[in-house]
Swiss-Prot record:
Subunit comment: Homohexamer.
Residue positions where N6-acetyllysine is found in the record: K64
NCBIfam families registered for this protein in UniProt: nagB
UniProt GO cellular component terms: cytoplasm
InterPro entries listed in its UniProt record: Glc/Gal-6P_isomerase (IPR006148), Glucosamine6P_isomerase (IPR004547), Glucosamine6P_isomerase_CS (IPR018321), NagB/RpiA_transferase-like (IPR037171)
Protein name in UniProt: Glucosamine-6-phosphate deaminase 1
Biological role: Catalyzes the reversible conversion of alpha-D-glucosamine 6-phosphate (GlcN-6P) into beta-D-fructose 6-phosphate (Fru-6P) and ammonium ion, a regulatory reaction step in de novo uridine diphosphate-N-acetyl-alpha-D-glucosamine (UDP-GlcNAc) biosynthesis via hexosamine pathway. Deamination is coupled to aldo-keto isomerization mediating the metabolic flux from UDP-GlcNAc toward Fru-6P. At high ammonium level can drive amination and isomerization of Fru-6P toward hexosamines and UDP-GlcNAc synthesis.
Transmembrane stretches, start-end: none
PROSITE patterns: GLC_GALNAC_ISOMERASE
EC number: 3.5.99.6
GO biological process: carbohydrate metabolic process; glucosamine catabolic process; N-acetylglucosamine catabolic process; N-acetylneuraminate catabolic process; UDP-N-acetylglucosamine biosynthetic process
Catalytic activity: alpha-D-glucosamine 6-phosphate + H2O = beta-D-fructose 6-phosphate + NH4(+)
A single MF term (Gene Ontology): identical protein binding
């Protein structure tokens, strides 16, 4: 497990974006080899998405051969509703990059058979070869996706009833009107995310400090579903200083002492421009008479 501690939200967002960029470029995706990326919604990943868009616009990164799978979607909310996760992803990320729409996968909360939709989503992940890197965020109660406290740590994609704390937290997106807030959602399971070859979890802000403490300093507990990722062989937690307020001083000191090593994951920062130059140079035949 790696814990990356940056000073501020913007730095944490940039580190995460650099990591995703390097992972995609090092994977060297192509027509017969897609990079599969799991993605979250919410305010936490917005800074990361903005940096990824910047990398694309600068010509340093392409999503042409990337397939994405989103974590969740509300049940009963029209796809074009401004607060649907379809709208969120298209407005904040997908429409700004070169990803093909057919390569984006978001659960359909209006499907006639919701469980069949969840089962099909799992099959699509398998057909894509599994998730290479699953990026996630958490709530103050430690839930990941909509795996609320008490969720099974081996759960799969399913229909989930939302906890009242989540409904109250989401009311701000629905004019503060609890009656407008969806009470159910489709969500990947903890087990679904655990199946990814690598997991990166973004945790920022003092309001999530206790959840981070539960995630890494205490034992695995289904009341704090994010704690399950202690047992994943390749978990990266990316956080800002505020999120570390509940951690022991020695824990923070230990992981900060590893930053010189961990920063090598994003430095050097790779670019598809460099890859294209290397490719063109290697394809040139030596001069001969």
């Amino acid at each position: 497990m790696k814990l990356i501690i940056l000073d501020h939200y913007s730095q944490a967002s940039e580190w995460a974006a650099k990591y995703i960029r390097n992972r995609i470029i090092q994977f060297n995706p192509g027509p017969d080899k897609y990079f599969t990326l799991g993605l979250p919604t919410g305010s936490t990943p917005l800074g990361c998405y903005k940096k990824l868009i910047e990398y694309y616009k600068n010509g340093d990164l392409s999503f042409k051969y990337v397939k994405t799978f989103n974590m969740d979607e509300y049940v009963g909310l029209p796809r074009d509703h401004p607060e649907s996760y379809h709208s969120f992803m298209w407005n904040n990320f997908f429409k700004h990059i070169d990803i093909h729409p057919e390569n984006t996968h978001i659960l359909d909360g209006n499907a006639a058979d919701l469980q069949a939709e969840c089962d099909a989503f799992e099959e699509k992940i398998k057909a894509a070869g599994g998730i290479e890197l699953f990026v996630g965020g958490i709530g103050p109660d430690g839930h990941i996706a909509f795996n609320e406290p008490g969720s099974s740590l081996v759960s799969r994609t399913r229909v989930k009833t939302l906890a009242m704390d989540t409904i109250l937290a989401n009311a701000r997106f629905f004019d503060g009107d609890l009656a407008k807030v969806p009470t159910m959602a489709l969500t990947v399971g903890v087990g679904t995310v655990m199946d990814a070859r690598e997991v990166m979890i973004l945790i920022t802000g003092a309001h999530k400090a206790f959840a981070l403490y539960k995630a890494i300093e205490e034992g695995v507990n289904h009341m704090w579903t994010v704690s399950a990722f202690q047992q994943h062989p390749r978990t990266v937690f990316v956080c800002d200083e505020d999120a570390t307020l509940e951690l022991k001083v020695k824990t923070v000191k230990y992981f900060k002492g590893l930053m010189l090593v961990h920063n090598k994951l994003v430095d050097p920062l790779y670019s598809i421009k460099e890859k294209e130059i290397e490719k063109s140079q290697s394809s040139k035949k030596p001069y001969s008479d």
